[in-house]
Amino acid sequence: MNQVARGAGAKRYADAKAALAGVVADGQTLAVGGFGLCGIPEALITALRDSAVSGLTVISNNAGVDGFGLGQLLATRQIRKMISSYVGENKEFERQYLAGELELEFNPQGTLAERLRAGGAGIPAFYTATGYGTIVADGKETREFDGKHYVLETALQADVALIKAWRADTAGNLVFRKTARNFNPACAMAGRICIAEVEEIVELGAIDPDQVHLPGIYVDRLVLNATPEKRIEQRTVRQGDK
């Protein structure tokens, strides 16, 4: 895999296509940030859709929706396997999975988050009570501690992490915007190479160190997307008085 320059001025790329070039390849495992459609790297996903890369394993909280987010990569059949938690908003995902065309490794949401965190921290595996006695535990080691039963879950790591942040400085220090932080930091730390899509890039020193959510040591490439669509996944409005 090509090495990525880590100098403060070398992390910014002209566009999402350039940011993906040389690091994303067929058959890789990608960790993609977001929670539903909140905090997803829209431009990077679209650029990935427009590339010829295929056979991907994607670790993500969700599978996007039809025609947006990771749903675009499912429509183009670029994803071979999903390691995910909530996938109920995507009809194409459902169709491919039920037809045996798509592999799925299903995880409780907290377990998925901890598997990513463990991967970033260099912890190979951990025990959790979540899923014991269910199909989640099938084929996995179980143990009893102090009278309680636990399932052994292994860490997750990715070849490349694609994440979304609100603001970055030129060294890659990131600030996330409220709930859009979600799975993004965990994905970044679990990726051997991390590409961050951000809405604003400022000079080094412009961000108060106490406000940095993810240090630049975890970020290899930056791409600016100042006006993401930020599509709403489920819109609920109050019924008018009758």
From Swiss-Prot:
It is an enzyme of class 2 (transferase). One of its GO terms (biological process) is lipopolysaccharide biosynthetic process. It catalyses: a 3-oxo acid + succinyl-CoA = a 3-oxoacyl-CoA + succinate. One of its GO terms (molecular function) is succinyl-CoA:3-oxo-acid CoA-transferase activity. InterPro entries: 3-oxoacid_CoA-transf_A, CoA_trans_fam_I, CoA_transf_BS, NagB/RpiA_transferase-like. Belongs to the 3-oxoacid CoA-transferase subunit A family. CoA binds at G33, G34, F35, G36, L37, C38, G39. This is Succinyl-CoA:3-ketoacid coenzyme A transferase subunit A. The lineage of its organism: Bacteria, Pseudomonadati, Pseudomonadota, Gammaproteobacteria, Lysobacterales. SMART domains: CoA_trans. Its EC number is 2.8.3.5. Heterodimer of a subunit A and a subunit B. It holds the Pfam family CoA_trans. The keyword Transferase applies. Keywords: Lipopolysaccharide biosynthesis, Transferase. Pathway: Bacterial outer membrane biogenesis; lipopolysaccharide biosynthesis.
